[in-house]
């Protein structure tokens, strides 16, 4: 794994150029796993701020050969010491072609400068061996005489079980650079049946012969703007071990990228997520320039929503959430045009929803249940995901979401809080129809005044209390709520009982206004109630 510096941009006004942090390119080797074929092969990843690129090794001609010539024909002169100077693996019995697995430095194969580890052997002295077994190719090479002509083509997607070395690109390579393969190497550096005893001239490149070089070539570039990451096998709740997949907005996928350790996977997950978040933030800033102050996007991004099947089975599906203006939106795909904002699967008023952190991992073996808002009914969150939150909406509707990182959970928590507080202050008050003992009443929650109840017909105020006077509440979970207020003069508790068509929306609204009021008076207190952010800061 490495990071390569790229050219730095001009320094922003007010910042010295020597303090400018250059853009960085992150690279690493990984396995690209084909879940259908259950096969994997080596790739190199290249991560920039905007793109994740998949690279595969290939042998390219750097001069002396017609463009597009993929096959190379090389004549080897067998040497008394070292033979052909190479080893091979594979064969038809393993479902792969015979490939060169080792090239020994300064011996016959190395001296040609035209053969590479990973080359598939296609012909030996004009005999096609593409479907030959390992032993058949070994026998043919050992008995091919002093001069052996082989035709090869680089195998770009060599199965990982071949354990071919991936050292510095070039003809020579340290044959001990990787773990051994279950397929043995047949060493052809030993002498075959030579007809002479005098030392043979080495296999040297001819001046006008084509020159080749092994390089990492870009094969797929996945744009990260509005992209999402998944660590789970599609359609299941099976967590891939040390693996992830990146899916672009247009549906393009990196495929399953398998890392050597869980730590490497976590490192790349964080790096890719950070770049996606940065690009999303840029998109939000551009969109907000065209929106009114009351219609700004506060936060948006991908999550996974838990869906309940008819047979009580549970599975998660990707959803795109957005907090904009007065609403919380749920989309099947990111909104990229003005019209898309009217095509949300769900839209809720921010004052009437309740955000709850449910759980996040403290370590590999322990998780913390975090009921962020005490005093309200707990919500069952039985799911296998690591970082979960729920959004409780009107009429008891609920949505459970998961994210890939604890940092994302903290960001969503803060974003919901900020968006809700902004909407409360913009709205100022909300009024709901209610009834008691057959009378139609109006109940108002006001950011400045607190609670007011007045007659729906005469508009006469029946009672009014400040937020600080609310000392408790209880409800039947359906339509009826009891609010307990303390009279400022008598210090006695007064009970006010009301009925609402959508009790959940009213309770959430009360909570939103009280939380916004507390935050306006003591912002530090609200931050102290954030379980997710508190854990992330301590860890």
Swiss-Prot record:
Protein's UniProt keywords contain Glycoprotein: no
GO cellular component, one term: sarcolemma
Alphabetical UniProt keywords: Actin-binding, Cell membrane, Cytoplasm, Cytoskeleton, Membrane
Residues annotated as domain PH: 296-421
Main location: membrane
Paired cysteines (S-S): none
Sequence ranges assigned to domain PDZ in this UniProt record: 73-156
Compartments reported by the entry: Cell membrane, Sarcolemma; Cytoplasm, Cytoskeleton
Ranges that cross the membrane: none
Membrane topology type: Peripheral membrane protein
Role of this protein: Adapter protein that binds to and probably organizes the subcellular localization of a variety of proteins. May link various receptors to the actin cytoskeleton and the dystrophin glycoprotein complex.
Domain-level remarks: The association with dystrophin or related proteins probably leaves the PDZ domain available to recruit proteins to the membrane.
Similarity comment: Belongs to the syntrophin family.
Name used for this protein in its record: Gamma-2-syntrophin
Species, as recorded: Mus musculus (Mouse)
């Amino acid at each position: 794994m490495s990071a390569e510096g790229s050219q730095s941009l001009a320094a922003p006004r007010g910042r010295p150029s020597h303090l400018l942090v250059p853009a960085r390119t992150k690279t690493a080797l990984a396995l690209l796993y084909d879940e259908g074929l259950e096969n994997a092969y080596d790739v190199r990843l290249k991560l920039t701020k905007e793109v994740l690129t998949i690279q595969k090794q290939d042998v390219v001609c750097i001069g002396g050969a017609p463009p597009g010539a993929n096959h190379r024909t090389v004549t080897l002169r067998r040497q008394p010491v070292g033979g052909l100077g190479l080893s091979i693996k594979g064969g038809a019995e393993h479902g792969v072609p015979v490939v060169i697995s080792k090239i020994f430095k300064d011996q016959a194969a190395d001296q040609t400068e035209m053969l590479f580890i990973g080359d598939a052997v296609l012909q030996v002295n004009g005999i096609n061996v593409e479907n030959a077994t390992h032993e058949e190719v070994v026998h043919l090479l050992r008995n091919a005489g002093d001069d052996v002509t082989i035709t090869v083509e680089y195998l770009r997607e060599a199965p990982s079980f071949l354990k071919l070395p991936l050292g510095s690109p070039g003809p020579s390579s340290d044959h001990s650079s990787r773990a051994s393969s279950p397929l043995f190497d047949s060493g052809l550096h030993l002498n075959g049946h030579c007809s002479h005893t005098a030392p043979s001239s080495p296999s040297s490149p001819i001046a006008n012969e084509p020159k080749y070089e092994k390089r990492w070539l870009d094969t797929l570039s996945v744009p990260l703007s509005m992209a999402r990451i998944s660590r789970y096998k599609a359609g299941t709740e099976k967590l891939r071990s040390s693996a992830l997949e990146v899916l672009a907005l247009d549906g393009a996928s990196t495929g399953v990228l398998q890392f050597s350790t869980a730590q490497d996977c976590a490192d790349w997950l964080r790096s890719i997520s950070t770049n996606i978040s940065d690009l999303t933030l840029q998109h939000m800033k551009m969109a907000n320039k065209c929106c009114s102050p009351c219609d700004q996007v506060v936060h948006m991004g991908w999550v996974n929503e838990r869906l309940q099947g008819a047979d009580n089975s549970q599975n998660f599906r990707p959803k795109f959430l957005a907090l904009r203006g007065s609403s919380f939106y749920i989309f099947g795909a990111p909104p990229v045009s003005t019209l898309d904002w009217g095509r949300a699967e769900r839209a809720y008023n921010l004052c009437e929803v309740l955000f709850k952190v449910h759980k996040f991992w403290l370590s590999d073996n322990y998780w913390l249940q975090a009921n962020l808002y005490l005093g309200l009914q707990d919500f069952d969150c039985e799911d296998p995901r690591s970082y979960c939150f729920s959004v409780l909406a009107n009429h008891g509707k609920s949505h459970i979401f998961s994210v890939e990182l604890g940092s994302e959970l903290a960001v969503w928590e803060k974003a919901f809080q900020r968006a809700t507080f902004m909407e409360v202050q913009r709205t100022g008050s909300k009024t709901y129809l209610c009834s008691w003992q057959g009378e139609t009443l109006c109940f108002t929650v006001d950011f400045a005044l607190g609670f007011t109840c007045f007659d729906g017909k005469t508009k006469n105020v029946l009672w009014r209390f400040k937020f600080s006077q609310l000392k408790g509440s209880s409800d039947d979970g359906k339509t009826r709520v009891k609010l307990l207020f303390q009279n400022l003069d008598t210090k006695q508790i007064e009970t006010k009982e009301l009925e609402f068509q959508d009790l959940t929306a009213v309770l959430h609204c009360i909570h939103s206004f009280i939380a916004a009021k507390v935050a306006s008076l003591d912002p530090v207190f609200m931050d102290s109630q954030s379980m997710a952010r508190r854990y992330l800061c301590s860890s």
